[in-house]
Amino acid sequence: MAVLENIEIRDILPHRYPMLLVDRILEMEEDRIVGMKNVTANEPFFTGHFPEYPVMPGVLIVEAMAQVGGVLVLKTVPDRKSKLVLFASIEEAKFRRPVLPGDTLILECKTLKRKETVVKMQGTATVNGQVVAEGIVMCKLVDRPAPSEPQG
């Protein structure tokens, strides 16, 4: 059973289709979180990456890790509706094997260091227990800008 379902994730993260890359949060502790992304053949990125051999772009695997980490960071912020978690950097990124349509991507982030508004996490992505990608993700907590007025 999931700790957070997709509707609850959408209440925490500002991302929406097609850029929301987390379907569920499976486990969550103070300094560790595990999320899941079902990678389907209908993902929009498979249209061009690559039509003959669809592979999930590595940058989107990293983004999915960062989103899972963002849930962990925002869950600890009292006034999270007024904050955003921005992806700041990735270090030591390694991609071990392709992620294909039909794969279930398990994304784990562990907090390594936290200073006021900056969080450093170890991210690991697995499929069927095999590491497909890993890296050190850095995120920054910032104030959410006020909604802009419609132009017209």
Predicted regions and their residues:
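Catalytic strand-loop segment that frames the active site of acyl-thioester-processing enzymes
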Residues: 17-56
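Conserved positions in beta-strands of structured domains
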Residues: 23-26, 91, 96, 108-112, ...
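Flexible, low-complexity linker/boundary loops enriched in proline and small hydrophobic residues
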Residues: 2-26, 33, 138, 148
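HotDog/MaoC-like acyl-thioester-processing domains
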Residues: 14, 100-103, 110-152
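Hydrophobic beta-strand-centered segment that forms part of the acyl-chain substrate-binding groove
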Residues: 1-3, 69-106, 132-134, 139-140
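Active-site helix/loop of acyl-thioester processing domains in fatty-acid/polyketide metabolism
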Residues: 25, 56-79
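Beta-strand-rich interaction surfaces with strong enrichment in secreted/lumenal proteins
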Residues: 10, 52, 95-97
